[in-house]
């Protein structure tokens, strides 16, 4: 009798849980408390590290990471909050919007690094008319993606508050993610083209032949360095500078993991709020949380501030397909070639602040809208 009773209770438990979570915004799934608290701690540590790196190295790329870190912490706070109440819309929106938008800022920072690398290796390796074109095109694309996603999230929030359908907001959100995925796919093609040029094409140029063979790998970077831009040879050749030597690999890992994560998020939203992906947390853990953690830890270790020697070396982004020092010396060119730390550091700061002006402004407006949304909902409840 006891065994029969236990078996009956055991078979009823899943049904009771499903009934209890029938109003779950996660399709019946309850976010794992331990995992989400762990992620809050991990992202809190990463956020602190990047604040310290910004203060110590004064490399402005950390601003992009800091925005990502804030959004990730808020997103996992939302998931932790949802554990105790899976029907709470405030917690769900905090999780969904913050975690979905967070990678936009990391990618904005990464786009800027390709322009830097083209400056280090030489303008002739740029497929676009100018190194800055990479930053301009893809950061603008990120801004569009961020704005569209923010509008979609806002429409969803308003629809929930009014008790109307969130279909329009969902479609707008999906469009924003689709723009981001398409932009990243194009960037990946340009990134691998750049890697092909600096690792394969230069070796072909060095041996004056075009064999497709693993023997090319036997040619060291030192042997072909004369084919790169001479001005920054000290960044490339110093033996102990392992951070720079593996920096391109780190960028590749970061972009591929974030791209994987964005494809997952797009598929999740397309399938729907009660679809298979959103109702099975392991997909989120592996394809979202783990991917973002790998990308951020990788770029924390191989931080651009270390790879490019932080504030001790400035790499101004200059226009054109030709390295500035090869042009006839005019006043404008002399300004570009002036490598005094104070002057070039100011240029570096201004360049990055200009490129991140609109993403940061949008980030502030977005956080303000989230705060206003939650505030208005609480007032309505009262």
UniProtKB/Swiss-Prot annotation:
**What induces it, per record?**
In response to loss of mitochondrial DNA in a transcription factor PDR3-dependent manner. Induced in response to altered glycerophospholipid asymmetry of the plasma membrane in a transcription factor PDR1-dependent manner.
What ranges does the Extracellular topological domain annotation cover?
A: 1-34, 79-90, 157-171, 263-281
Q: Name one GO biological process term.
A: lipid transport
Any coiled-coil ranges, and where? none
Membrane topology category: Multi-pass membrane protein
Question: Which residues bear sugar attachments?
Answer: 3, 6
Q: Where in the cell is it found?
A: Cell membrane
Name the PANTHER family on file. Answer: PROTEIN RTA1-RELATED, SPHINGOID LONG-CHAIN BASE TRANSPORTER RSB1
Q: Which family does it belong to?
A: Belongs to the lipid-translocating exporter (LTE) (TC 9.A.26.1) family.
* Protein name as annotated: Sphingoid long-chain base transporter RSB1
Q: What is the species listed in this Swiss-Prot or TrEMBL entry?
A: Saccharomyces cerevisiae (strain JAY291) (Baker's yeast)
Taxonomically, what lineage is the organism? Answer: Eukaryota, Fungi, Dikarya, Ascomycota, Saccharomycotina
